[in-house]
Amino acid sequence: MVQNAVNGALSYQVWDSSNFLLNLRFSDSFLNKTKKYPIYRDLRFAARIDLEALLDELALDDNNQPLRIDSKSLIIESDGALILCRGSLKKEYCSCYFSIWGKSVDDVEKIKKNILTKVDENIIHEPMFSINWHFLTSKNEMESVNIEELANDVLLNEAYPDFNEGLIEFIDSYIRSKEAVLVLQGPPGTGKTRLIRAILGRMSSHKGSNASAVYTGDKKTMESDEIFVRFITGWEDAFVVEDADHMLKPRSEGNDNLHRFLTIADGVIRSQGRKIIFSTNLPNVGDIDDALIRPGRCFARVSVRLLDLTEAMNLVTSLLKGQDATSYIDGLKRSGKKHFSLADIYKAIAV
């Protein structure tokens, strides 16, 4: 019998200690040929709870063997299961994400039910969407964080006066369309991010469950194929690139990254009804590569702009919903400004 020995070295840079510990565990199981956790499920929700208190309760359960990574993450080994618990904090709620490995489907479902029982009265049932935010670490490695977001942004037609149809009608048309690409173009403060959030929230309504999106605003994440591969092979409904000026410029000006989007927009992404949304501060339509916004690939290139005084007064009146808007309107007039950003108006009214 001939035996072959293979020697090698593996370099592993650690950004997330919980992932590192899990990978060690999985490697050990694989090398020892143990079939310990053949079933995997995940559980995610948002709730108005104290995240640390929830993880404390899980860690102190006598049936669990916990390894507390930090205040927002926990690894648990219990009878026949391995659980990675993570959370992130928002102002009024927290997002929770559980990766669960078990011996059987029944075991995993019981664990999910037990976790949900602890937070049942505080789970948020309003429409939400999930952002899978991608970024590069200081070690130049791509990482991502999942964040559950409430789809509760105030979106009024008065904020976008150039739409020929209502905003909801426009968004619904985009979601139902075959075209994958939408470009939102305009100066800072004109409501591009708010509109993107409204689109994702509307996707959730169409699905009957939380929509999800790969999100990045980091130029460096677009310089390799990794984030594109993650989107193509993932389950997210949309790919959102904010501040995408560098991505949209003509290829004749040295833009070497756009071809990846052109390829996926016409391929599997379109056939699956998934979407690609760009926001950009580029001032002119001529600043964007024609191939990206051609009919059949791009649903629309939407220009959003600052509001003039009359439009700003109309928006203030609509935002206040019948309340006395006199003081706010007088403030707009006294400012001496000819144009107003949505950001300034929403901030003044605290929306």
Where are these regions (language model features)?
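Short glycine-rich substrate-engagement loop in P-loop NTPases that contacts/grips substrate
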Residues: F163-E165, L200, S204-W235, G254-N255
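Conserved catalytic/switch belt of AAA+ P-loop NTPases
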Residues: D245-S279, P283-R294
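C-terminal alpha-helical "lid" subdomain
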Residues: L60, L84-G87, A291, R297-V351
